[in-house]
């Protein structure tokens, strides 16, 4: 009996020792993990963000000047685990509109009279990472502009809550009245933009041009610069529109069906053997990208003209219709801002709508990517700051704070500097 009691006490002590050892090891692991992590947070989201941040020590002017020591700092940060605020925290942060607006300094945005008289509309089709969406909104925000946000039916509750909070905090930000379940390369992606365009036309803001963005875009121009460039268009549209290759023609010469797939996208259009009829109204097919800068008159035409409606219906079972719908409509004779069919191709380099760096064209058409690649597209790194700002494009894709938080911070800083300088210059 005594022997059993001794064994029981030994077992208890051993159990306590093992549990204590596990807790110590876990705490050491957490400390090492935290020491090797960088937290990217808008000011005031959590208590941690009230303390000095690693990014505070980055000199963006030195990054712009490609000073080796400062570029080295950014590379050192990228070796660490980069942690961004989750959607729940952003939803909580944006729930108190007064505090949120003050801490993110929306109330300090400066604009000129020229900008006030030239409002811009935005269609933001997003589905995740509310922290990045908020940073995009802050970078393009001006009180005279108007912003439509289309989230995805599949987005998380916290993400949707954060988007709805943004709507609540600003009179010129709203959620699209109709929300799609967006599928990759499917008509739903095009419809998401069309839903926003319809709502934007119904708004009281008499915007001149509309620009569409996704959650991995970022501006390269200040609002003042955008207004200056948009005025130069003089009613024309700006987007890619080129004659399709044989491979691209396959996208609309055959019918596609949305099917379950075993990889990343889960569902996507799959080609069938059923040939499609030619497009209605003898529309000549051109291809481009999903990105556009469109005049109000052109959008009004697309939303109301039977030709455009018929073409949209014809495009329903094509592959990635957003990449040929706009490119083809821009060439239709008689549309506002028409680009004649006989005019040369407008490539992504000629159109200033979006700067995308493809890995197979690097070191031929543009410098090598200093970030990383995802599906052949460069996710920009800090060393590309100067090139991005001097290239001449208006927006770029792709950015990811978990890949390189420095490039986004420095773009924010440089664009704010430019807007301030331009406003002060107009006043003086």
From Swiss-Prot:
Parts of the chain that traverse the membrane: 13-30
Residue ranges, Cytoplasmic side: 1-12
Catalysed transformations (reactions): a 3-O-[beta-D-galactosyl-(1->3)-N-acetyl-alpha-D-galactosaminyl]-L-seryl-[protein] + UDP-N-acetyl-alpha-D-glucosamine = 3-O-{beta-D-galactosyl-(1->3)-[N-acetyl-beta-D-glucosaminyl-(1->6)]-N-acetyl-alpha-D-galactosaminyl}-L-seryl-[protein] + UDP + H(+); a 3-O-[beta-D-galactosyl-(1->3)-N-acetyl-alpha-D-galactosaminyl]-L-threonyl-[protein] + UDP-N-acetyl-alpha-D-glucosamine = a 3-O-{beta-D-galactosyl-(1->3)-[N-acetyl-beta-D-glucosaminyl-(1->6)]-N-acetyl-alpha-D-galactosaminyl}-L-threonyl-[protein] + UDP + H(+)
A Pfam family it matches: Branch
Cellular component GO terms, alphabetical: Golgi membrane
Alphabetical list of PANTHER family matching this protein: BETA-1,3-GALACTOSYL-O-GLYCOSYL-GLYCOPROTEIN BETA-1,6-N-ACETYLGLUCOSAMINYLTRANSFERASE 4, GLYCOSYLTRANSFERASE 14 FAMILY MEMBER
The protein, known as: Beta-1,3-galactosyl-O-glycosyl-glycoprotein beta-1,6-N-acetylglucosaminyltransferase 4
Species, as recorded: Danio rerio
């Amino acid at each position: 009996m005594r022997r059993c009691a001794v064994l029981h006490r030994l077992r208890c002590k051993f159990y306590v020792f093992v549990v204590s050892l596990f807790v110590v090891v876990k705490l050491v692991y957490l400390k090492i993990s935290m020491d090797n992590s960088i937290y990217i947070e808008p000011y005031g989201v959590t208590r941690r963000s009230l303390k000095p941040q690693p990014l505070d020590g980055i000199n963006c002017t030195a990054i712009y000047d490609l000073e080796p020591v400062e570029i080295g700092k950014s590379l050192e940060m990228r070796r660490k685990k980069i942690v961004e605020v989750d959607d729940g925290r952003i939803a909580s942060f944006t729930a108190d509109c007064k505090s949120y607006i003050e801490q993110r300094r929306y109330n300090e945005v400066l604009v000129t009279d020229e900008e006030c008289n030239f409002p811009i509309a935005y269609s933001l089709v997003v589905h995740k990472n509310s922290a990045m969406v908020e940073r995009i909104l802050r970078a393009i925000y001006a009180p005279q502009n108007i912003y439509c946000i289309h989230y995805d039916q599949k987005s998380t509750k916290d993400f949707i809550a954060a988007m709805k909070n943004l709507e609540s905090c600003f009179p010129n930000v709203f959620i699209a009245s109709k929300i799609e379940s967006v599928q990759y390369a499917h008509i739903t992606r095009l419809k998401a933009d069309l839903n926003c365009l319809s709502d934007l036309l119904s708004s009281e803001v008499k915007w001149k041009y509309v620009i569409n963005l996704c959650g991995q875009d970022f501006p390269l121009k200040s609002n003042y610069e955008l207004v200056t460039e948009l005025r130069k268009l003089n009613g024309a549209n700006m987007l890619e529109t080129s004659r399709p290759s044989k491979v691209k023609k396959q996208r609309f010469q055959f019918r596609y069906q949305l099917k379950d797939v075993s990889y990343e996208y889960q569902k996507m259009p799959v080609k069938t053997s059923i040939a499609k009829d030619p497009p209605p109204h003898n529309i000549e097919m051109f291809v481009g990208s999903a990105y556009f800068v469109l005049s109000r008159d052109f959008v009004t035409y697309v939303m109301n003209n039977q030709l455009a409606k018929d073409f949209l219906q014809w495009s329903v079972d094509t592959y990635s219709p957003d990449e040929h719908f706009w490119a083809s409509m821009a060439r239709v004779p008689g549309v506002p801002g028409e680009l004649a069919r006989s005019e040369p191709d407008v490539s992504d380099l000629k159109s200033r709508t979006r700067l995308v760096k493809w890995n197979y064209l690097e070191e031929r058409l543009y410098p090598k990517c200093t970030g990383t690649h995802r599906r052949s597209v460069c996710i920009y790194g800090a060393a590309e700051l100067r090139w991005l700002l001097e290239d001449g494009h208006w927006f770029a894709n792709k950015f990811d704070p978990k890949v390189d938080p420095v490039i986004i911070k420095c773009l924010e800083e440089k664009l704010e500097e430019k807007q301030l300088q331009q406003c002060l210059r107009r006043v003086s």
